[in-house]
Amino acid sequence: MKATEQHYSIKEAMLFSQRIAQLSKALWKSIEKDWQRWIKPFDLNINEHHILWIAYHFKGASISEIAKFGVMHVSTAFNFSKKLEEKGLLSFSKKQDDKRNTYIELTEKGEEVLMKLMETYDPTKNAVFNGALPLRELYGKFPEILEMMCIVRNIYGDDFMEIFERAFENIKEDFIEQDGKLVKRKPKTEEHEKELASQAN
């Protein structure tokens, strides 16, 4: 058997790629609308919010990492990072051992904005969430989208998916639900002190 032998027809390939393209376009339109509505009160656009999100999970990222994991051109990552710096949400720096790359980190104000955004997330205003809700009610969990993740891994590589997964693990670890909102978990020492104080009373 030749290595170049196809196990699919051109028609099958075209139908699959066009189905993915059309579904992705439809989903993106809805995602974009909801995302913009969510961040609008904070005077951010989608690229700016995405950069803040990546900077939070990286705890300091290079512009090239922002571009890679934000799926944007390096110049886009740099220009929007500059705008965030002007707003006081990011700071730029160079590392002693790496003068070629520019690194960004969230400022205190930047982290505050990101935390407030997390608190204002309202699932009832998210069309994709609401579209998936009947599946959760039927199967007891949200779709895991494993096949889609596999396709993305094959296009963007393992590094991309590792960061993707790390971001969601961080949310599980760093945030708790309180009064119907997502809030940042207090540092363990602070939680422990509160626990001791309540036991003493």
From Swiss-Prot:
Any one Gene Ontology molecular-function term assigned to this protein's record: DNA-binding transcription factor activity
Q: Which Gene3D superfamilies match?
A: Winged helix-like DNA-binding domain superfamily/Winged helix DNA-binding domain
- Where is the stretch described as Disordered? 182-201
Q: Which residues bind DNA?
A: 63-86
State the UniProt keywords alphabetically: DNA-binding, Repressor, Sporulation, Transcription, Transcription regulation
Residue ranges annotated for the HTH marR-type domain, each copy included: 13-157
A GO BP entry: response to stress
Assembly and binders = Homodimer.
| NCBIfam families assigned | PRK13777.1
Mind telling me which HAMAP family this protein's record contains?
Answer: HTH_type_Hpr (MF_01911)
Q: What does this protein do?
A: Negative regulator of protease production and sporulation.
- The identity of this protein, by name, is HTH-type transcriptional regulator Hpr
